[in-house]
Design a protein with these regions (language model features):
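Glycine-rich, acidic and aromatic/proline-enriched surface loops and short helix-turn segments
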Residues: 101-110, 152
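Extracellular beta-strand-rich recognition modules
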Residues: 305-311, 371
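Juxtacatalytic substrate-recognition/specificity segment
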Residues: 1-99, 109-117, 121-129
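Extracytoplasmic/secreted proteins, especially bacterial periplasmic and envelope-associated proteins
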Residues: 2, 70, 74, 78, ...
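Beta-strand-rich interaction surfaces with strong enrichment in secreted/lumenal proteins
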Residues: 280-284, 293-298, 352-358, 369-370
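Active-site-proximal alpha-helical
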Residues: 121-205
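Exoplasmic/lumenal beta-rich domain surfaces
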Residues: 325-371
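Beta/coil-rich, acidic/histidine-enriched accessory regions frequently appended to metallopeptidases
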Residues: 168-293, 310, 318-325, 332
Length: 371
């Protein structure tokens, strides 16, 4: 009931027309996974054959055995995901994971500070991007701390406004701020939050720029602040989008000029189109489908008909798929086409037929016979 009062309600009675929420303990939750909520279980089995068709938590019986605190921690975290899915199914991971971490804290069951410590020791972590490879631990820490600052600054009632917003990320926060007639913007709150983290790291308590009733783990050896020489010099550095770098310039008394140059915008992708200036980008959003459709009149075509194209993809292997489909009846029915680099393997149950998954390793050419 407490989490519902803060974040909102899950789908209830939901897909199974049952008010109850179910939990399944199994030894096959996945390597290193304590538990999870799968949005697939909110689908009808006729749409998603692997759906359990109920509001369900999958919990690892081996890793959680004899550890009731960890069970409560995992359930509180995953319940926020279940609630968020009911209101804004494709919310970005930074907000969704941050709110789930906050759910742990609010029920007094956040068991580890390793996430926050990892972030504060290197705060140049994006608050708008989520990694597809490498460690996500500091991202969990950053997202939790920002969510905690939001709750402290605007009150717990504001959290539900963000959850209910169909817009994602900072756009959703801005929309929620307008709804409550706040004069803040998400960017302003981000700037305040970066100041709060710095002041906390320096041992300075400053009212609004601080966390309420919470003390994050201090970074070791002041590692969040980088020292620079005050002598006349220039240097190059990089920063993640909505990441933070802190610099210390110990200078003698006098007048100094600091000039900062940077890029006002960045490309969406790190790779260039295979030719020309443009390529079609499929977007990168949770629980979402993006498509491109074009009509061709092949009624007078003679001989072999081939569809040729270049593509480059980076997908979560076995869970996210890219398909090529054809309809010969105006879109009433669709047939998935087999391609040279695709697969019909479906261990996860997410492959709808024949698709690409994993990493392509760069641009490559595909040619499909449509005859």
């Amino acid at each position: 009931p407490f989490e519902r009062s803060v974040f909102g309600s899950e789908l209830s009675p939901g897909i199974d027309h049952d008010l109850r929420i179910h939990a399944l303990f199994t030894k096959k939750a996945g390597a290193g996974i304590l538990g999870y909520f799968s949005s697939r279980d909110e689908d009808h089995p006729q749409v998603s054959p692997h759906s359990n068709a109920m509001e369900l938590f999958i919990l690892d019986s081996t890793m959680l055995a004899g550890n009731p605190d960890q069970i409560t921690n995992t359930l509180s975290h995953e319940f926020q995901h279940m609630i968020h899915y009911a209101h804004d199914a494709n919310e970005g991971s930074n907000i969704d994971e941050g709110f789930s971490g906050l759910a742990e804290y609010l029920i007094h069951n956040r068991l580890s500070e390793a996430y926050e410590r990892s972030f504060l020791e290197n705060p140049d972590i994006s608050l708008t991007l989520w990694p597809v490879s490498g460690s996500s631990i500091p991202y969990y820490g950053a997202s939790f701390l920002f969510s905690k600052y939001l709750a402290d600054r605007l009150g717990q009632d504001f959290l539900n406004k963000v959850v209910e917003q169909p817009r994602n990320g900072f756009e959703g926060i801005d929309a929620a701020l307008k709804e409550v007639k706040s004069t803040f913007t998400a960017d302003q709150l981000f700037a305040e939050w970066t100041a709060a983290n710095l002041l906390y790291g320096l041992g300075i308590s400053n009212g609004e720029f601080s966390y309420r009733d919470y003390e994050p783990p201090l970074p070791k050896n002041g590692s969040m602040i980088k020292s620079l020489s005050c002598k006349n010099q220039s240097f190059d550095s990089t920063a993640m989008q909505y990441g933070t770098d802190y610099y210390n310039l110990p200078c003698d008394a006098g007048t100094y000029e600091i000039e900062i140059t940077g890029q006002p915008t960045i490309p969406i992708l790190s790779m260039n189109p295979i030719q020309g200036q443009y390529a079609w980008w499929s977007n990168s959003v949770n629980n979402s489908d993006t498509w491109m459709q074009h009509n061709f009149d092949l009624s007078n075509a003679k001989g072999s008909i081939r569809f040729e194209f270049d593509l480059n993809y980076d997908l979560e292997e076995a869970y996210d798929f890219l398909y090529l489909s054809l309809s010969a009846d105006g879109g009433k029915t669709w047939q998935m086409l087999k391609t040279a680099h695709g697969t019909d393997l479906n261990e996860s149950g997410f492959n709808l037929g024949w698709g690409w998954t994993g990493k392509s390793g760069g641009w490559f050419h595909e040619s499909v016979n449509l005859s």
